[in-house]
Amino acid sequence: MISSVQNVSNLSMTRALGAVDTENSASSSAATMPGTAGAANGVSFASVMGNMASDAVNSLKGAESMSFAGIKGTATTREVVDSMLQAEQTLQTAIAIRDKVVSAFLEVTKMQM
């Protein structure tokens, strides 16, 4: 997907968007199909959630270290703010997923057996 975005951003004003090669668009459309990515790779839901949790922790640790670097004067204000905004977005995503998991659990407990 990133390569597709880079290809679109590299287009000049005189070229049409149709000039983007079809290989990248085909690969990006296949990657967005909901049922095929996990089934083809054999990736479990637990491993995806575990990877996401470790990425969230790494993002928060990176923001913390960047804030310390900002206090020391070795990082610019922009770098600190970008790191903090990324950590905030990661935290908001984790909170939203937690809320969905809790609501799904509550729905399951309400089911009659």
Curated annotation (Swiss-Prot):
Gene: fliE
Source species, domain of life: Bacteria
Keyword Thylakoid: no
Location in the cell: Bacterial flagellum basal body
Organism annotation: Rhizobium etli (strain CIAT 652)
Keyword terms, alphabetized: Bacterial flagellum
Family note: Belongs to the FliE family.
Gene Ontology MF terms: cytoskeletal motor activity; structural molecule activity
Entry coiled-coil feature ranges: none
GO terms of biological process kind: bacterial-type flagellum-dependent cell motility
InterPro entries (alphabetical): FliE (IPR001624)
Protein name as annotated: Flagellar hook-basal body complex protein FliE
Pfam families the UniProt entry points to: FliE
One GO CC annotation: bacterial-type flagellum basal body
Membrane-spanning intervals of the chain: none
Disulfide bonds: none
